Amino acid sequence: PSNGNQQDLVLTTQGCGKNGETMNYKFDGNKVFFTSDTHFYHANIINFCKRPFANVETMNEALIENWNAVVGANDIVFHLGDFCFGGSAEWTNILNRLNGKIYLIIGNHDLKNLRKGYYKRFEDVVMQMHIEVDKQRIYLNHCPFLCYAGAYDGAWQLFGHVHTCENNTGKDAPRLNMIFPTQYDVGVDNNSFTPLSFEQVKRIIEKQVEQFNKNNR
């Protein structure tokens, strides 16, 4: 039941994927971007992830500038969770300044920060998605999957949450050694604090698959 601040989540299910799986959407890769874990207005994330910003205001401005430098007004952005902290003023300020049409896949922090009034500001708000971009099947979730059927037939899984960065020594670091080469952390800490285009993700995953195949000959 709703608690008055949040509304019940309903997964959008349009179309049908391979083997009868639900396929949420199909998109043109020329206008698609991915990102995660911006943590707008979250001061503690600067120390927790050793982000190179003096304060939360500087961080917010850098994230907004980087976002708008690559994302146009009519582009599509899949944000894989932990979008923003704060209340109405903070969320409104950020959403008013970001380019693009944003689909939000809910992260663990969004569960407590996302309010009902913000749902209409996104193209959709869901727990996870299964999309197709230029015939490439992609699973989107806030957290990495330990296993998923798509790993065996070329599908990707994009995620956030783990804040991958250089010399990552967090508690999730050992687990990341178990992921498939068709998985990738699109979070800002792993990608110069900037959304990635579909083509950028494609090149990264192709390189990961190539390296995996080379190491397992």
Where are these regions (language model features)?
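Exposed boundary/loop context
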Residues: D8-T13, N74, G100, D153, ...
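Conserved beta-sheet core of the metallophosphoesterase superfamily
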Residues: Y119-N213
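Core catalytic region of metal-dependent phosphoesterases/phosphodiesterases
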Residues: K26-G29, F33-T35, F40-V133
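Acidic, histidine-bearing metal-coordination/catalytic regions of metal-dependent phosphoesterases
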Residues: Q6-A54, Y184-R217
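Compositionally biased, intrinsically disordered low-complexity regions
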Residues: Q6, G17-T22, A89, I102, ...
